[in-house]
């Protein structure tokens, strides 16, 4: 257990608060992403997870999320760094900010051709959490910045 003196009171971070568990859940999700552990990511999702794609459609369900991960794996190799997670006190919502370091190795439909271009791009995500599972993931990044970096 960690205890810190903050603003005149001691703050305890021991993993027992819902806020702590939400933060840990999101960090575990991103750790699995960075390892390429798609099964590990899927295990953290609710069966009816809602996934809002950046500037795209809303997809629902773990199977749709698995299909998304397979498509991403075919076109991109990415690592998220400098991850910061904030969670609501009740643990029902969380937000993350990160920097994507990636390589575009397989052309993705509607985007410029892939030739192994690299990119560094800030991004963020919002989460809803129900019953210690991720029920919604909404991702944001600047698509125009990414296109400029890969030469589109």
Enumerate the predicted regions with their spans.
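C-terminal and inter-domain tail/linker signature
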Residues: 3-152
């Amino acid at each position: 257990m960690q205890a810190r003196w903050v603003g005149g009171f001691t703050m305890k971070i021991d993993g027992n608060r819902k806020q702590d568990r939400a933060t840990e859940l999101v960090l575990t999700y991103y750790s699995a992403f960075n390892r390429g552990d798609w099964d590990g990511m899927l295990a953290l999702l609710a069966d009816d997870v809602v996934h809002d794609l950046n500037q795209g459609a809303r997809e629902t369900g773990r199977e749709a999320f698995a299909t998304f991960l397979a498509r991403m794996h075919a076109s991109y190799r990415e690592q998220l760094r400098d991850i910061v997670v904030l969670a609501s006190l009740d643990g029902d919502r969380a937000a993350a900010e990160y920097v994507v370091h990636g390589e575009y190795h397989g052309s993705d439909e509607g985007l410029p051709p892939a030739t192994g271009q690299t990119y560094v791009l800030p991004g963020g995500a919002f989460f809803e959490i129900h019953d210690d599972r991720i029920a919604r993931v909404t991702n944001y990044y600047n698509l125009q910045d990414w296109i400029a970096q890969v030469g589109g």
